[in-house]
A protein has these predicted regions:
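A glycine/serine/threonine-rich, flexible loop-to-helix segment
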Residues: 150, 162-186
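Short C-terminal tail/terminal secondary-structure segment
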Residues: 122, 203, 214-227
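Canonical Rossmann dinucleotide-binding motif of NAD(H)/NADP(H)-dependent dehydrogenases/reductases
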Residues: 2-36
Length: 227
């Protein structure tokens, strides 16, 4: 029997080759979604609107934004590092929403899910730039969601860390004994959340069964974010 959890939904996933993109595309399609995988860079101010226009009708937008995380101490962060990180992670988000939200409001139906980071919820050394950018995403979600909810459009975010993905936790990082020791010591789950586990949760949030969530930020980090 075919899986119809997301049947009939057109879901646009940005940066589909990065971060959670590959697994999201696979899992959401398995659940019956018509997946539109965008691989364009979104740093050009005109790119987000162009991507949304090219996609046609979008029932669900998954803002899957990623950039290699800088590991600079706060005292040494350059203006270039700060600006380029925000240009990749923060600036495209309101541009995407501006492009996709009007049609959702008109239809009185839609979902926007931001694939964020738990570094916005709990600090880590040498992640001040990255954590600040991810926190800006969450701040935007919290306010924009309140405005969209009155039109039956839900905006939420997954704040993840220690989840399998090719951008931040590639296989070569996972194989390092030092990293494995860190996981056992610092992450209550004792392992990485699998990419599929994360994507299955995203699929639920995109479904009609999750229509009650407004401006929610869901930590998916093996217990690390709540310690």
């Amino acid at each position: 029997m075919p899986d119809t959890l997301l049947g009939g939904l057109r879901i646009l996933i940005t940066q589909a080759d990065d971060f959670m993109g590959p697994t999201l595309c696979e899992v959401l399609a398995e659940h019956g979604a018509d997946v539109i995988a965008s691989r364009e860079s979104l740093t050009d101010p005109t790119a987000p609107a162009a991507v949304v226009t090219a996609a046609g009708r979008v029932d669900v937008l998954i803002a899957n934004l990623a950039v290699p995380a800088p590991s600079t101490e706060a005292v040494s962060i350059s203006d270039d590092e700060w600006r380029s990180t925000f240009a990749a992670l923060v600036d495209p988000l309101p541009r995407l929403v501006r492009a996709v939200l009007p049609s959702m409001i008109e239809r009185k139906s839609g979902r926007i899910l931001v694939m964020g980071s738990a570094t916005a919820l709990r600090g880590m050394r040498r992640t001040a730039t990255y954590g600040a950018a991810r926190a800006a995403q969450i701040g935007y979600v919290l306010s924009a969601a309140l405005e969209a909810a009155q039109h039956n459009v839900q905006i939420n975010a997954i704040a993840q860390n220690f989840v399998e993905n090719p951008t931040y936790y590639p296989v070569e990082v996972q194989a390092k004994p030092r990293f494995q020791e860190f996981m056992k010591r610092e992450v209550p789950l004792g392992r990485l959340v699998s990419a599929r586990e994360d994507a299955e949760f995203a699929a639920y949030l995109c479904s009609k069964a999750a229509a009650c969530f407004v401006g929610q930020v869901f930590p998916v980090a093996g217990g690390w974010a709540i310690r």
